[in-house]
Structure formats: C-alpha cells, structure tokens
Curated annotation (Swiss-Prot):
2,3-didehydrotyrosine PTM sites in chain numbering: 67
Record's protein name: GFP-like fluorescent chromoprotein FP538
2-tetrahydro-2-pyridyl-5-imidazolinone (Lys-Gly) cross-link site: 66-68
Native source species: Zoanthus sp.
Lineage of origin: Eukaryota, Metazoa, Cnidaria, Anthozoa, Hexacorallia
PTM field: Contains a chromophore consisting of modified amino acid residues. The chromophore is formed by autocatalytic backbone condensation between Xaa-N and Gly-(N+2), and oxidation of Tyr-(N+1) to didehydrotyrosine. In addition, the residue N lysine undergoes cyclization. Maturation of the chromophore requires nothing other than molecular oxygen.
InterPro entries listed in its UniProt record: GFP (IPR009017), GFP-related (IPR011584)
Biotechnology: Fluorescent proteins have become a useful and ubiquitous tool for making chimeric proteins, where they function as a fluorescent protein tag. Typically they tolerate N- and C-terminal fusion to a broad variety of proteins. They have been expressed in most known cell types and are used as a noninvasive fluorescent marker in living cells and organisms. They enable a wide range of applications where they have functioned as a cell lineage tracer, reporter of gene expression, or as a measure of protein-protein interactions.
C-alpha cells in the first residue's frame, strides 16, 4: 500500500471534539493524540471542558472515541482496508449501544484527514438515556471495556460496512455489564473495492489523568483485523 495515496503516514496526530448528553446532563469533551495507522495503535488524551465533572462513568464515552476509529487498525495484505482506502475524505460511523438494563446510547462520528496538517479530525455527538440511578454507569462502578472482537460485514450495494459485537464493561466488584454494539461505517467516497467479511480484535484501556481543575483521562487502543480461520 502506498501510504501517500491515502494521505496517511506511519505516525499521525489526532484531534477530537465530542458534544453529548447522558440522562439529561450535557457536556463537551476535547482531546488530542498520536496514532500509528499501519500498526493499529493509538493513544489520546481527553478533557471535559463543559459539564464536568461527569456524573456518570466516562467508560461509556470511550467507545465513541475508539472502537470505530478504524483507520488505526492493523490490516493484513489479504483483506481490503476499507477505512484507509476512504482517506483522505474519510468516513462516518453511527453506533447504537443497548445495555443489559435497558439503557440506550447513540453515537454519530465524522472522521476526516488533513494531509497538510498530518492530522485526523474526529467529531462526534453522543446521546445516552435510561441509565438507572443505582446502576453501574451512574454509580461509576466500571473500570474498563473488556477486550473484544467485532464482526465486520460488507453491504456492497450500499458501499457500507456493518459491525456487530457484544461488549462487556468490567466492574469494580469483579462483575461484567453487557452491551450490544451495532455499527454502520460509511466511506464519504464510493469504495473502489469492498472487503470480505472479517473480524477486528481490539483492546482499549483507560487511565485517569484528572487534576484539581479538570476531569481528564487517557485512552490507548490496539486493533488487529483478521479473516476467519475456518472460512
């Protein structure tokens, strides 16, 4: 793959902006980071600039910043990389989150690449509702998302990919909190070639970096695409 063809380099900077509302609480988050598209690794630092401190677990937002920024996925040569091929125009993705206790979130994201700035811009809108007051999200009992594997399915007639994965938030008491992710990825330009169905394995870690003035945290992710060993 000719990296310059898609406006991507081995190392890219990222800038993030999210506006959202969870259980009626509005907030704005910004962030910056560094990622390695061809190694599938990235690290970002986020800060709540409006609406902080958040009255709910920030882990539910992590999946709006990551688990969809698929440019940073290590793809083998035998699988078409839909996400890098969409650059520099980029792509959009929309995701529904259905939690086991009936809570629901919707996240819509727009991703573009600035070749001049060597930067990937990530803008998102996040809305969540119906989180129980005594549940793990509102009581901030989550610690991180468990490593997982998303099935990626092409829809050639529409030029989109659909993602399906059952996710689990790890809890402080050792339990798990289940959430179903359904995602639609759509390139802004017409794809010249679609991939076959495949999987993306990913691991996301959050570390608190808050100070006396602002709620902050760091996210690191590693993502690798692979075909079925049995297909």
């Amino acid at each position: 793959m000719a990296h310059s063809k898609h406006g991507l380099k081995e190392e890219m900077t990222m800038k993030y902006h999210m506006e959202g509302c969870v259980n009626g609480h509005k907030f704005v988050i910004t962030g910056e980071g560094i990622g390695y598209p061809f190694k599938g690794k990235q690290t970002i630092n986020l800060c709540v600039i409006e609406g902080g401190p958040l009255p709910f677990s920030e882990d539910i937002l992590s999946a709006g910043f990551k688990y969809g920024d698929r440019i940073f996925t290590e793809y083998p040569q035998d699988i078409v990389d839909y996400f890098k091929n969409s650059c520099p125009a980029g792509y959009t993705w929309g995701r529904s989150f259905l939690f086991e206790d009936g809570a629901v979130c919707i996240c819509n994201v727009d991703i573009t690449v600035s070749v001049k700035e060597n930067c990937i811009y990530h803008k998102s809108i996040f809305n969540g509702m119906n989180f129980p007051a005594d549940g793990p999200v509102m009581k901030k009992m989550t610690t991180n998302w468990e490593a997982s594997c998303e099935k990626i399915m092409p829809v050639p007639k529409q030029g989109i990919l659909k993602g399906d994965v059952s996710m689990y938030l790890l809890l402080k008491d050792g339990g798990r909190y289940r959430c179903q992710f359904d995602t639609v990825y759509k390139a802004k330009s017409v794809p010249s070639k679609m991939p076959e169905w495949h999987f993306i394995q990913h691991k996301l870690l959050r570390e608190d970096r808050s100070d006396a003035k602002n709620q902050k945290w760091q996210l690191t992710e590693h993502a690798i695409a692979f075909p079925s060993a049995l297909a």
